[in-house]
Amino acid sequence: MAGVKTFELRTKSKEQLESQLVELKQELATLKVQKLQRPSLPRIHTVRKNIARVLTVINLNQRENVRAFYAGKKYIPKDLRAKKTRALRRKLTKFEASQETEKARKQRIAFPQRKFAIKA
């Protein structure tokens, strides 16, 4: 098995991916044993990268499923939330920023902004 293509992995089911992962890990184990007799085995590199690709696709699928589960819910796990910056995460929402105290509301109503007309 040469390089595994990621676009091919994305079409496979979870069971197929897990079985392929087991096969790749077994192949890696045999290659590690062969390395003792014959050093400088470049095949180990490709097998390790293939294992990483399979694991990446499995993790992406899991995160996608969890994201779909929490879609529309009030609370979302922190690792699925938008990263943003610390300051942006703490920023007031539009609704919170528009709130005003009762005293400020009464003052705004009692003393509206004056409108001036200019003589032409």
From Swiss-Prot:
Highest taxon, organism lineage: Eukaryota
Pfam families: Ribosomal_L29
Biological processes, Gene Ontology terms: maturation of LSU-rRNA from tricistronic rRNA transcript (SSU-rRNA, 5.8S rRNA, LSU-rRNA); translation
Subcellular localization, as worded in the UniProt entry: Cytoplasm
Single GO MF annotation: mRNA binding
The keyword Ribonucleoprotein is assigned to this record: yes
Gene Ontology cellular component annotations, sorted alphabetically: cytosolic large ribosomal subunit; preribosome
Record-linked Gene3D superfamilies: 1.10.287.310, 6.10.250.3450
InterPro entries registered for this protein in UniProt: Ribosomal_uL29, Ribosomal_uL29_euk, Ribosomal_uL29_sf
NCBIfam families, A to Z: L29
PANTHER family named among the record's database cross-references: 60S RIBOSOMAL PROTEIN L35, LARGE RIBOSOMAL SUBUNIT PROTEIN UL29-RELATED
Oligomeric and partner information: Component of the large ribosomal subunit. Mature ribosomes consist of a small (40S) and a large (60S) subunit. The 40S subunit contains about 32 different proteins and 1 molecule of RNA (18S). The 60S subunit contains 45 different proteins and 3 molecules of RNA (25S, 5.8S and 5S).
HAMAP family noted in UniProt: Ribosomal_uL29
Full protein name: Large ribosomal subunit protein uL29
Species in which this protein is naturally found: Candida albicans (strain SC5314 / ATCC MYA-2876)
